[in-house]
UniProtKB/Swiss-Prot annotation:
One of its GO terms (molecular function) is aspartic-type endopeptidase activity. GO terms for biological process: proteolysis; regulation of immune system process. Residues 1-28 form the signal peptide. It comes from the Eukaryota. Keywords: Disulfide bond, Glycoprotein, Pyrrolidone carboxylic acid, Secreted, Signal. Disulfide bonds join 65-91, 89-123. The modification Pyrrolidone carboxylic acid is found at residue 29. This is Prolactin-inducible protein homolog. The lineage of its organism: Eukaryota, Metazoa, Chordata, Craniata, Vertebrata.
Length: 146
């Protein structure tokens, strides 16, 4: 009874503070998971007709799996394995690593692109999600040819 009398005498700010402490803070905004994390590595310089290897590691912090289509694109045409496109299941416990070996005679800007798509037969039991906010992620690097 005394506690009830105390609450009626307390200020509205105190009541709000007690309510927030009792219910706990909303952790949804503090614990935002990243959809795609990219680590794209290519050499910064290369010689003419030298074979260059591009490596892209893709991972997610989401608990659900996604179907990821991964490819490279550039501002100038590049022949060979540069044009390979990969489609794999991406889950939080297993990052995917992709490799491209190619030759170029010109300085080129390369974008590593990850599209989250809807495709059956890629993830186990076709259990995959598609983000609502954004489904294309990319990183751009420049390869200077000397």
């Amino acid at each position: 009874m005394r506690l009830l009398q105390f609450l009626f005498r307390a200020s509205p700010a105190t009541l709000l503070l007690v309510l927030c402490l009792h219910l706990g803070a909303n952790k949804a905004q503090e614990n935002t998971r990243r959809i795609i994390i990219q680590n794209f590595e290519i050499p910064t310089t290369a010689n003419r007709d030298e074979e260059v290897t591009a490596v892209l590691q893709v991972k997610t912090e989401l608990k659900e799996c996604m179907v990821a289509k991964v490819y490279l694109t550039s501002d100038v045409p590049v022949e060979g394995a540069f044009n390979y496109k990969y489609t794999r299941c991406l889950c939080d416990d297993y990052p995917n690593t992709y490799y491209w070996d190619f030759h170029t005679n010109r300085t080129v800007q390369i974008a590593a692109v990850v599209d989250i798509i809807r495709e059956l037969g890629i993830c186990p039991n076709d259990a995959a999600v598609t983000p609502i906010s954004k489904n294309r992620f990319y990183t751009i690097k420049t390869l200077v040819v000397a």
